[in-house]
Swiss-Prot record:
Function text: Catalyzes the anaerobic oxidation of oxalate using a broad range of electron acceptors, including ferredoxin and the nickel-dependent carbon monoxide dehydrogenase. Does not require coenzyme A as cosubstrate. Enables anaerobic growth on oxalate which is used as energy source by the bacteria.
Upper classification of the organism: Bacteria, Bacillati, Bacillota, Clostridia, Moorellales
EC number, as in UniProt: 1.2.7.10
Species whose genome carries this gene: Moorella thermoacetica (strain ATCC 39073 / JCM 9320)
Subunit record text: Dimer of heterotrimer of one alpha, one beta and one delta subunit.
Reaction(s) this enzyme catalyzes, per UniProt: oxidized 2[4Fe-4S]-[ferredoxin] + oxalate = reduced 2[4Fe-4S]-[ferredoxin] + 2 CO2
Name of the featured protein: Oxalate oxidoreductase subunit beta
Length: 314
């Protein structure tokens, strides 16, 4: 069992995702990997479907992992993890190894968890494999040129959703809510959570809680992307915090059919305070932002966030 971390000063000193990779400055997914690896510890195997954290971390001489890591296709992270888990259990059962059963963690981007890789993820969860599946969500297919994904927000300017005369808002669709898809579609699943790099202790404790579960668990981690979202690289943590403070991303755990909020928010900032700092939303008109505000209000209400929206200068 992995113990709860009381504070950031009590977090493990050891690093299992170390410098030497080629991620962008201010990369949210890189910080996600660092925190997850720190929480999980040395007895861990990572499965990395194709995505930013595969492309930026696997050039010759640039591998940042101090624990075993295996590449999977973007479609099959859940299947590869299922095979590793089954093989370890078989070897232990047949006394072919005396090694302790490892922490098996899939680290997939939103493409590998919410879109192309959803089928293998769902099958892994349904079969009950003892695996923690984590989505690091940077809200686009970023390593191939910032294409839209199912988690890209409404109104975002991406290479596949450029704003123009016919479609002035850019992306017309609202984002898929994958944590709820997972939670409500897999009734035997014991633990679903969301996390943010803006709250590192909460993130690490959720990783440990997910690993301590018997059977599978799913954690969806919000990981801002300076390049894709078009904000300064030194503002990544500010963006992560604003996403939660505005309700654009909600922090909670889902257990026993109930949502438990992770961060107390007395009032929410309007989504405009978050969106105005990202050039991917620079083309939006007030009516588009109002549409996004209404959508966020509804999503917040679904998990029990009912506090009023109050502007910072109010």
């Amino acid at each position: 069992m992995l113990d709860r971390i009381a504070s950031i000063k009590k977090a493990p000193d050891e690093e299992y995702y170390v410098p030497g990779h080629r991620t962008c400055a201010g990369c949210g997914p890189a910080l996600t990997y660092r925190l997850v690896a720190k929480a999980a510890g040395p007895n861990t195997i990572f499965i990395g479907p194709t995505g930013c954290m595969y492309v930026a971390n696997t050039s010759y001489g640039c591998g940042p992992w101090r624990v075993p890591w295996i590449h999977a296709q973007i479609t099959n992270g859940g299947a590869v993890a299922s095979g590793i888990e089954a093989a370890y259990k078989a070897m232990i059962r047949k006394k072919k190894t005396d090694a302790e059963f490892p922490n098996i963690i899939v680290m997939a981007g939103d493409g590998g968890a919410v879109d192309i890789g959803l089928q293998a993820l769902s099958a892994m969860l349904y079969r009950g494999h003892d695996v923690l599946f984590i989505c690091y969500d940077n809200e686009s297919y970023a390593n191939t040129g910032i294409q839209t994904s199912p988690t890209t927000p409404y109104g975002a300017n991406t290479t596949f959703t450029p704003p123009g005369e016919v479609v002035p808002e850019g992306k017309k669709l609202f984002p898929k809510d994958n944590p709820k898809v997972i939670a409500h579609g897999h009734p035997e699943l014991k633990y679903v959570a969301t996390a943010s790099i803006g709250w590192p202790v909460d993130l690490m404790n959720k990783v440990r809680k997910g690993l301590n579960q018997e059977g599978p668990a799913y954690i969806h981690i919000h990981a801002p992307c300076p390049k894709g979202w078009q904000f300064p690289a030194d503002k990544t943590i500010e963006m992560a915090k604003l996403a939660v403070q505005t309700g654009m991303f909600q922090l909670y755990e889902y257990e026993n059919g109930e949502y438990k909020l992770s961060v107390k928010v007395d009032k929410r900032k309007p989504v405009s305070e978050y969106m105005k700092l990202q050039k991917r939303f620079a083309h939006l008109k007030p009516e588009h932002i109002a549409k996004m505000q209404a959508f966020v209000d509804a999503r917040c209400a679904e998990v029990g966030i009912t506090v009023p929206v109050v502007a910072s200068n109010a």
